[in-house]
């Protein structure tokens, strides 16, 4: 089933309602990180260039639903967009019963979470939003995994529902990485807990040629291999699960390699002293915070031979430089690789920024939870809705 793309539509004189992910950090009324806003600009500019009357909506933060709270107002986003687009951008506070918007104009709706029923995908609210437009554009990959009124319900009732360029790019990149990858396909999954990424690990272990685990997740696999992990964060109740995942990968000719050397310390602190040890020499008082140089080189070799790389999560506590060498080496290997690479998730993007490899990664996903759910093999509610409307 084909999804309609906004770029293929004639929008001249049309009222176009775009759902973007403009959920950005704001401090004292000023946007402090504009990555999501920058990512949304080409879609808004394209709608204007196509002669549309443009309405934009998003959530911002986690206000109490149905209650106005100035702390979560879209005003700072409106100010940013007015500068970035070099045109007048208005904030509409009461818009559900109709809003005046002219061709060539941009109106941003106040925080959609100020509307009661937004998160429950309320039908009446969805229909009111749909009545405001001729064309609804879903462009917020970061919220595509949530079935809410502004991301899902509105699209069921709008005259036309389509994917914006940003969402289309995300789906193309993820499809290229997972549905039809150039092999070998290597996935790097980091993070603190196996439990939060278990479904991802299960899904990926069935399709990748090599699965690399890092961070606290790796500690559980180290313990499963029979090594002492000392006071490290790990999940004893998931050791059998880790063994099963390794066996599953090996049965397909792949593997989930366990680090041979690790970087440990006696405490979790920015000033903790880092000590390099063989994985078999970890003491009861040690905490593992990174992989060692031998392990990092072995993983770099796996990455260098890859045809496709999916990266979600650092392999160490890279926020502290003494525990960042493993993640830095992985980042460098991805940057040097000729493979198609996709990176996603907040910590991963922070590592991409820290090690300056953004322009060397083929595609950087804007979605956190949505990226993970896609890796889990789930169909995202927004995508299901767009397929239904495109049929």
UniProtKB/Swiss-Prot annotation:
GO terms for biological process: gluconeogenesis; glycolytic process. Keywords: ATP-binding, Cytoplasm, Glycolysis, Kinase, Nucleotide-binding, Transferase. ATP binds at residues 197, 319, 345-348. Pfam families: PGK. The keyword Glycosyltransferase does not apply. It is an enzyme of class 2 (transferase). GO terms for molecular function: ADP binding; ATP binding; phosphoglycerate kinase activity. It catalyses: (2R)-3-phosphoglycerate + ATP = (2R)-3-phospho-glyceroyl phosphate + ADP. It is found in: Cytoplasm. One of its GO terms (cellular component) is cytosol. Its main location: cytoplasm. Substrate binds at residues 21-23, 36, 59-62, 113, 146. Its EC number is 2.7.2.3. Pathway: Carbohydrate degradation; glycolysis; pyruvate from D-glyceraldehyde 3-phosphate: step 2/5. Monomer. Belongs to the phosphoglycerate kinase family. PANTHER family: PHOSPHOGLYCERATE KINASE, PHOSPHOGLYCERATE KINASE 1, CHLOROPLASTIC-RELATED. This is Phosphoglycerate kinase.
């Amino acid at each position: 089933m084909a999804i309609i793309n906004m770029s293929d539509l004639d929008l001249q004189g049309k009222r176009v309602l775009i759902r973007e992910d403009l959920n950005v950090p704001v401090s004292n009324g000023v946007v402090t990180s504009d990555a999501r806003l920058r990512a949304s600009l080409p879609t808004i500019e394209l709608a204007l260039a196509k002669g549309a009357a443009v309405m934009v909506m998003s959530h911002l933060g986690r206000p109490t639903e149905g209650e106005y709270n100035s702390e979560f107002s879209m005003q700072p986003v409106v100010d940013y967009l007015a500068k970035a687009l070099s045109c007048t951008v208005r904030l509409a506070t009461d818009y559900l019963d109709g809003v005046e918007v002219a061709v060539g104009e941009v109106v941003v709706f106040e925080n959609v979470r100020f509307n009661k029923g937004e998160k429950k995908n309320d039908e009446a609210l969805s229909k009111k939003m749909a009545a405001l437009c001729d064309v609804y554009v879903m462009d917020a990959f970061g919220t595509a995994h949530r079935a809410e009124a502004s991301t899902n319900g509105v699209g069921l009732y709008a005259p036309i529902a389509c994917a914006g360029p940003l969402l289309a790019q995300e789906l193309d990149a993820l499809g290229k990485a997972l549905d039809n990858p150039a092999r070998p396909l290597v996935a790097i999954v980091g993070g603190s807990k196996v439990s939060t990424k278990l479904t991802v690990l299960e899904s990926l272990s069935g399709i990748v040629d090599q699965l690399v685990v890092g961070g606290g997740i790796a500690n559980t696999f180290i313990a499963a291999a029979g090594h002492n992990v000392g006071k490290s964060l790990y999940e004893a109740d998931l050791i059998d699960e880790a063994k099963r995942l390794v066996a599953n990968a090996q049965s397909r000719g792949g593997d989930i390699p366990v680090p041979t050397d690790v970087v440990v310390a006696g405490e979790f602190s920015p000033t903790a002293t880092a000590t390099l040890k063989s994985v078999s020499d970890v003491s009861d008082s040690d905490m593992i915070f990174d992989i060692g140089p031998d392990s990092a080189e072995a993983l770099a070799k796996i990455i260098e031979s890859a045809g496709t790389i999916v990266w979600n999560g650092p392999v160490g506590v890279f926020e502290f430089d003494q525990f960042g060498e493993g993640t830095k080496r992985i980042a460098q290997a991805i940057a040097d690789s000729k493979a198609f690479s996709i990176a996603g998730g907040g910590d991963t993007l922070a590592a991409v920024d820290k090690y300056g490899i953004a322009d060397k990664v083929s595609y950087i996903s804007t979605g956190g939870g949505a990226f993970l759910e896609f890796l889990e093999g789930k169909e995202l509610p927004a995508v299901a809705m767009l397929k239904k409307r495109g049929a």
